[in-house]
Amino acid sequence: MSFQPKKNKKMQKKKLRIYNPKIKEECGVFGISNTKDASTLTALGLHALQHRGQEGCGIVSFDGMKYHSEKRFGLVGDNFNNEEVLSKLPGNYAIGHNRYSTTGGTTLRNVQPFYADTNAGGIAVS
């Protein structure tokens, strides 16, 4: 004799929600390391990814000693298009981010990359 639980018809009809691994186009991220003019190349990379987010953009660079950050509302081409802005981002390492808002308000503090520069070291993430 075997025991088999009764099948619930509602459960049979209910579809399971399974994680869909399909790539979603939200935000754009670009990074580069050990390269001269890293912030300029990062701005170009973000420009190529502009379709991934238009709300805001930011770049964090690292010069081997300190992190430097510039974040702006709007398009990459309107914000990181001159030497005056890019000269504020020295270093051979940089990451950039185009914001496509999925959560949080439209504030500059929600524009990435985020970074922490401490006496013990630092980190930048996007």
Regions found by a protein language model. Give the residues of each.
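N-terminal glutamine amidotransferase
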Residues: S2-S126
